[in-house]
Amino acid sequence: MAPDDESKKRATRKSTKRWKEEHQVATEIPERFREGDDEDEDCTAGHALNKSVFGMIAAASSIVDFNARFDAQSSDEEYDLGKPTRQSSESHINRSSIDQKMGKFEGHRRLLSESKILRSFSRFSSRSKSKSSNTIARGSRTPSPLRESRQEPTSPEIRYSPLQPKDTPVMSRMLEARAELSLRPSFEMPRKSKDPAEVDDERTSPDSLAERLMEIFKFETPEDVLEEYPCWLMKSVLLQGYMYITTKHICFYAYLPKKANEVVKSGYLSKSGRHNPKYNRYWFRLKDDVLSYYTNPSDLYFPSGNIDLRYGISASIVEKEKGKDSTHFTVETHQRKYNFNADSAPSAKEWVKALQKIIFRSHNDGDSVKISLPIENIIDIEDSRIIDFADTCKIRIIDNDETYAIDEYFFSFFTNGKLALSVLKILVGDTAAQKIPEELLSPLSTADDSRGSSKRTSFQVSRDRKLHGPSVQPNAPALEETVRATLSPLLAPGAGSPRASTDMSLSSSDIFRRSLDINKHGRRSIDLNRLTTEHHRSNSANSISTRRSLSTNRLDQEKRTSKQGSSDSYVHSLEEPGSSEALPSASDETQASASQILRGSDVFLSPTIQHSPSVACNRNKDEIQGPKSRSLTSPIKSADVSPTRTQRPQHPKHAATTGSVSDSNVGQAEISSGPSLQSIVKAGSYPLQRAAGFAGYLNRHSKRMSTLLASESMGYVEKVSGMWKGGKKHYEEPHGIPRDNEMPSIGDDDDNRDGATPADRFRDHFALPPDEKLHATYFGYLQRVLPLYGKIYISDRSFCFRSLLPGTRTKFILPLKDIENVDKEKGFRFGYSGLVITIRGHEEIFFEFNQAENRDDCAITLLQNVETMQYMQDSGLLTMYERESAEMAGAEHRALIQARRGIRSEHDIDMHKAADGGSQSISFDDPRASILNFKPTEPLRITCLTIGSRGDVQPYIALCKGLMAEGHQTKIATHLEFKEWIESHGIEFAPVDGDPAELMRICVENGMFTVSFLKEASSKFRGWIDDLLSSSWRACQNSDILIESPSAMAGIHIAEALRIPYFRAFTMPWTRTRAYPHAFAVPEHKLGGSYNYVTYLMFDTVFWRAISGQVNRWRQKELNLQATGLEKMQPNKVPFLYNFSPSVVVPPLDYSDWIRVTGYWFLDEGANYTPPKDLTDFIANARADGKRLVYVGFGSIVVADSAVLTKTVVASVLKADVRCILSKGWSDRLEKKGANNVEIPLPPEIFQIKSAPHDWLFSQVDAAAHHGGAGTTGASLRAGIPTIIRPFFGDQFFFGQRVEDLGVGVLIKKINVSVFSRALWEATHSERIITKARVLGEQIRKENGVDTAIQSIYRDMEYAKSLIKCKEGKSDDDTLEDSEESWTFIGDDTDPELIKRFYDWESMAHSGTLSDKNMMAWSGSDVASAALSPTRKAA
């Protein structure tokens, strides 16, 4: 390392250490908050049994496995099919503050992108150095004159910590990491990127089109542009672009930006196995360059297999019967052919189109397609009638003057085609290529279709010429240039494997620039005789070059090795057992990793005889070269197909699908003359007819047997035993520069001896992009149906798991951006340590470790990576280099547009102006949107039925105001005490019996659905329920739509009696899911998806059994309906509107399509609120004194002793040294004294208010502490302030847990001075919590829950009506045998047959010709098979 580099590194370490020292005091919790005498006390604790029935079950279930999960069902072959390994590249982490403007940073990036420094980005990673601030960052909240003067300092930046020594105690690392995490803000908000159209090109901007073309296509001098035409390049797809005809070249340019992290298509398909022709049905998802398939669409983190389309060759329809549209199609890769069967012919065509586009993109380097054809190389130009409505020309061109391979390019012109063809023919009237003798030209191969661009690659032709030795014609004219293109050739399967290179992929301009320099010195070809002779002198195959000279990745520095498919990966050679070729060297097994040894061991896999392509290759060369060359030949394959953007060295690697290790490797070290233990074992597995050779082999090598057993057997045993023992391994510093291509990882020397780094194998196992960087690995158990032993991988973007047990193929891929929190808990088994990963919208995933030290290390490493991931711009969707490449391609595209405008010809008509805008994404219209998503032509009478506190009523006021703005008549039926408030907003009111304060008292004193609650409710609320049902029936008369909170209990029966559409709406989860527990049954510790799902079943059952008798009597007496039950009501099929934010409660994957998480329904009343002067003065004084201001209020909660609670709050505020706005609200509602009476004198640091609008109040404070009600929680989160929640009952525990999981606040289970004061200090000083809360607040403020809810009502209106029609058609004695029937509506939204059926069904339904039975039959069979939209699935 250079001295200046070393000094920079030391300076970085010093600055990192200095940054830690500066902030250590600020992030450490002060001593006064550490411990307290009242740590275990709770001033709000009740005297009665306050334990929920569900809590008791959860506590008793600690010895019961509630975490049984559906295991992924594998087909007969799976994902890892021997794909080549990949070279990692670096991604740049932007560490500038989230509060800073990006202008300066973008300018810096622009300068970087234009400099030559970027050429070396594949080896270096830049580290930005910026000053950190000691001040606490504040969120951008609702503007207020009281807060405008407050400074908004920047938040601290991430610094790389030095590599931890191997013997560093894990506790020290944990404490250090916790200190860093508390300091570190979390940037979940994507950075504001500059519009590409606004990026100025700071280079010297040539004005002429000729100079632009010289820059883009790297001509030596500007060439006059004769003509330019919009045209289409015809390959497997049609690519729209422009043809530029200059004096020396015919150039084609198309802007083809890549799209990262985008699901292109998803749906059900049937797939046949490798050896089993039976088709198995899977859920497929096409994302980026990978086609993944799953046994369960809700388990997207457990793929059954992956198909890497970067190695794809083609996707095509397979005709089974002539004249009929086929539903079968195939996907070919360099290794094998995959067979698929779609549900319909249009669906198959859509899949093939999508796959062809992805394969085409993946074989292009950069974000633009460039083809440069030298005119002197063109043989002829012919008309080709491929498309009837377009003029198409075929250009035959010689690739270079060494191989004389002929390529064909097809271009179609939709306008001015005749003129373009005449110009081209005149231009190539007399070229050097036409003077080359015919015997030198390579014959065209017929393997490719007529539209392929490359009929035969240069390497194939060169190989044939070297083997057959054609005579060279010295009088052939020389060709000065070669064809250059960013597109790679597509070879037939088995012809080769993907190319490999240690270089990062370059942008299109870099590719052109560097290929130009190489082409000046002529092209290089490979001499097979020389290669095979010199093979043993090198550890890797010689570099060879294919005809695509445009990509440097295919030139000098490629390392070629043969790569077998997984079926050929475990090769038992039939050569002489005594030869070194027949038996692998010692490094094949003893130098492999433990998992490779286990998978490749003959103990677990019976050896089979498999033929390898290399055998035939050797034989062919033997026939040509003679017997003398037999001992020196090695299997060499032809030119390799290139994957996407980044190439990497080829290595034999572990094939997870077949459990095998490739034995054939061209790039292996010198063939060992000595035997190995594993070679003897493998030799013993050969057929008996080779026994003579085997005996001779033993006789020759028996003298060295003792040395072999002593030296090599321990390597095998130690690695396998070490794998089963478990452990951990770090491959780099947690957030530093990857060391895969710099130096062997710590303790990983053996793993790297075969040339493949652990990071390479990791990326191959999970089909991850080449720039994915491996940080650490661990051995542990994944808790599913049974504990599944395997290996855990943590990278900079993903958390992965791979099972190691023989016979299992489970893989788990979890993006770090989907992780909400990581908790450490006790294991399910005695002596094991547990790790719980909370995932957005998914059930928790549990892991177990046999050592607590490994569990702690894994938790800290994972948390650090998750936090770093949130800092990365665009959440790591694109690396910095890819962004730079995309920007450069965009700049080239805009420059061409600008240059063309100056010489716009008559050829550019309107239909081709779309090409200027780049590649537009294809948008598929949802067929249901045009049918169901409509606004009613006439105003509707909408009634909202709810009971409870003020927080339960307020969202309905906001919804009704939105509906009134749409022209509808609204009414709210609730408790009498809210009448004035509701009518003040112009909403009609209808009374419902019941005292919310009495209900609140029972809930608080007894807990929700506890034993004492059930006792008191059954004794006191029998009459109350009867009154509630009767009053609700009267209140809901004259309604067209009923929207009800399910806690009101009567709505679903009233809607059935009135025969009107019925919707449910609630503030807490009420629908069965595995992602979250029922809001009334939140356990102390996470218990997994099975427990979560069971809580809903138990609650529904218990709740219905408690009220079913009264409800059925009421139905028969007042509603004139038959008695019912849960099976007949089908409550899980009712359309549901959840009025909380999808950013707070992420919609689970198993929610049905009629379950909508709309966002909060806020009733903003702060605009008309005038705060009292003493309150504004108090706030101003707190700001002037530099004190943090908090809000404390427990709203609609009744406590046993409000005086003790007030005293505790006062003491905590004084201890935390903050100012407090105290709102007591209903906390003393049932007490005889007035609500304004204060039990103890309040100090000047506390200001008491009775009430204030949350939208105004929370914008004035720095943190809020409250009970965790849905409405109050939503208001504090929207304000972007940290939230402290002390739950009392009901859904408050659920939202408290969500706040803690999201990292935007603190959940406390008890209130005392020690706990509450520490929570106040942490909420006002933790930069991590403050920043996360600010980012979440910005996300919530962008939502409009009321508008989303209204549109959801419109969209699901017909579905709600269909439920009423189904019930009308049932006879009295109908038992609804199919009551639990559910359909999954998933798949192809553009299926024309499906759209037609929807319209037919809609028209028949309106005309009355469709019977209810037919309606149900159609919605079952056809929709299940045709599959409509993701997530329409009954829970």
Curated annotation (Swiss-Prot):
Gene Ontology CC: phagophore assembly site membrane
Regions of compositional bias (Low complexity) in chain numbering: 123-133
Keyword Glycosyltransferase: yes
Binding positions (UDP-alpha-D-glucose): 949-950, 952, 1252, 1254, 1267, 1271-1272, 1291-1292
GO molecular function: sterol 3-beta-glucosyltransferase activity; UDP-glycosyltransferase activity
Annotated EC: 2.4.1.-, 2.4.1.173
Entry's free-text remark on domains: The GRAM and PH domains are required for the localization of ATG26 to the preautophagosomal structure (PAS) and are involved in autophagy.
Protein name per the record: Sterol 3-beta-glucosyltransferase
Native species: Sclerotinia sclerotiorum (strain ATCC 18683 / 1980 / Ss-1)
Organism phylogeny: Eukaryota, Fungi, Dikarya, Ascomycota, Pezizomycotina
Gene that specifies this protein: atg26
